[in-house]
């Protein structure tokens, strides 16, 4: 994997294996008010993240194997059915979330991206409502398809499923 650091390490570009993009399945895609987009995809090797302006080279591309990705599944309560997925790049975490408002008539989808360094929030992007391409439970489903299962006793994912 090739990596380039720019600035203070907040922006790191890494090259994905060529074969990874060919069989990718989109988990989340949306546009933000600033004209940029985020795409989150999965393949047999892990999760890929792209952020930047459409039609241009992405500002940030990450690819992480499943054992380096954190997925928080919906706990089963609340107005929204939601989940989030976090990818780490050094000390910076890119947390993407998707939700469905189950109490509204239209069952509106929403999604977004939160960039954090430790406990500090560096940036927050809300997806434009009409741009959200997200299927409820797709983060958890992708993790399960990769061979992980959620344990309700200790609220963790494990590789050895019974």
Q: PLM ranges: what are they?
A:
Residues 1-9:
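Bacterial N-terminal signal peptides that target proteins for export
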Residues 22-162:
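Cysteine-centric segments in proteins
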Residues 14-21:
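C-terminal segment of classical bacterial N-terminal signal peptides
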């Amino acid at each position: 994997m090739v990596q380039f650091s720019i600035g203070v390490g907040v922006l790191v570009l890494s090259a994905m294996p060529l074969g990874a993009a060919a069989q990718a399945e989109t988990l989340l895609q949306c546009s933000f008010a600033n004209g940029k987009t985020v795409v989150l995809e999965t393949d047999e090797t892990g999760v890929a993240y792209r952020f930047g302006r459409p039609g241009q080279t992405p500002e940030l591309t990450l690819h992480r194997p499943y054992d380096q990705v954190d997925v928080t599944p919906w706990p089963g309560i609340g107005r929204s059915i939601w989940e989030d997925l976090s990818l780490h790049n050094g000390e910076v975490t890119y947390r993407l979330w998707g939700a469905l408002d189950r109490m509204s008539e239209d069952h509106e989808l929403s999604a977004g991206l939160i960039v954090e360094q430790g406990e500090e929030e560096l940036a927050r992007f809300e997806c434009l409502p009409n741009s959200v391409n997200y299927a409820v439970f797709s983060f958890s489903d992708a993790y399960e398809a990769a061979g992980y299962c959620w344990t309700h006793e200790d609220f963790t994912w494990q590789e050895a499923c019974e």
